[in-house]
């Protein structure tokens, strides 16, 4: 039986502002497909990205490049959860499996604003997935990323087994003489880290939200933002922690519910908007319609709710 060549999908997009509204140019190759873009509040280009192959197998590669011009605003999401199929032990020629790889490169110019919000990544048993996210931006630009991964199809009683998930996030601020690091975040989950109390402790869902803010945050702003994020954990299950960056915020979720991770990150997302005087985000049309993560949540820049006592 003839083996199929792995996919290498590429997507390169440029965003420019015209009369207060951001437009995109560029294109992609299979298995990527761009859906119709919406114009959100403040002229933001909201663009869903579709992976038409129905899932990723060992050896597949995805490359995404996003370039934002001055004053442009964009929200990039995916149409559905991304599946990564098992690789380890599936081939006699390659019993150790082959890694599926995804690289995302984001380059932001002055006062631009990018929100990278893909839907959930689901690793099947024995899947190998490695991702890199590289961001460069000036001090007056904003970058927000929220990513959620489920390690094994737990509803079917499946675990990750011999699979592994690797992630490398690097954010650099453009400097007058040389760039400076905002964040370098390298993670690997698999083997003992899945059940170790210093790892996931048996939780199958992990998520990270990172915000590189477009301005230095005062001590009061950081205090209010962190207090609000902790308050937003109320009614949700899992271990949720957050802390400040030099100029921004990082939040982590570990638990059993991708829904609760999505709800918490959506509420923090709304707070980052409010802090900049922007409107509350509209949930992308391709996200689950039955969910309303922002319902009943106050998102004001000067609110100081009581922090949750759990987790």
Curated annotation (Swiss-Prot):
Keyword Kinase carried by entry: no
Keywords noted in UniProt: Chaperone, Cytoplasm, Nickel insertion
InterPro entries, per the entry: UreD
Record Pfam families: UreD
Subcellular location(s) per record: Cytoplasm
GO molecular function: nickel cation binding
GO cellular component, one term: cytoplasm
Record family assignment: Belongs to the UreD family.
Subunit structure: UreD, UreF and UreG form a complex that acts as a GTP-hydrolysis-dependent molecular chaperone, activating the urease apoprotein by helping to assemble the nickel containing metallocenter of UreC. The UreE protein probably delivers the nickel.
Record function comment: Required for maturation of urease via the functional incorporation of the urease nickel metallocenter.
PANTHER family: UREASE ACCESSORY PROTEIN D
Designated name of the protein: Urease accessory protein UreD
Organism: Parasynechococcus marenigrum (strain WH8102)
């Amino acid at each position: 039986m003839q083996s199929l060549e792995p996919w290498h999908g590429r997507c390169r997009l440029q965003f420019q502002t015209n009369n207060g509204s951001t437009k995109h140019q560029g294109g992609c190759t299979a298995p990527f497909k761009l859906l119709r873009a919406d114009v959100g509040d403040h002229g933001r280009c909201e663009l869903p990205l579709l992976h038409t192959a129905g899932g990723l197998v060992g050896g597949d590669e995805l490359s995404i490049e996003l370039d934002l011009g001055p004053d442009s605003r964009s929200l990039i999401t995916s149409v559905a959860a991304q599946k990564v199929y098992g690789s380890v032990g599936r081939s006699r020629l390659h019993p150790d499996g082959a890694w599926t790889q995804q690289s995302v490169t984001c380059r932001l110019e002055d006062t631009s604003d990018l929100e990278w919000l893909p839907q959930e990544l689901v690793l099947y048993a024995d899947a190998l997935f490695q991702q890199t996210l590289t961001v460069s931006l000036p001090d007056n630009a904003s970058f927000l990323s929220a990513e959620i991964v489920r390690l094994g199809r737990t509803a079917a009683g499946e675990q990750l087994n011999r699979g592994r998930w690797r992630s490398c996030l690097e954010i650099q601020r453009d400097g007058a003489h040389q760039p400076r690091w905002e964040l370098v975040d390298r993670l690997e989950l698999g083997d003992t880290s899945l059940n170790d109390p210093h790892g996931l402790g048996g939780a199958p869902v992990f998520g990270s939200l990172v915000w590189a803010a477009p301005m230095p945050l005062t001590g009061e702003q950081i205090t209010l933002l962190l207090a609000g994020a902790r308050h937003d954990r109320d009614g949700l299950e899992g271990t949720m922690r957050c802390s400040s960056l030099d100029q921004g915020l990082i939040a982590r979720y570990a638990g059993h519910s991708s829904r609760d991770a999505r709800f918490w990150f959506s509420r923090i997302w709304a707070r980052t908007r409010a802090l900049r005087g922007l409107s509350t985000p509209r949930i992308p049309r391709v996200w689950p319609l039955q969910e309303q993560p922002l319902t009943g949540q106050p998102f004001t820049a000067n609110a100081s709710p009581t922090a949750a006592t759990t987790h």
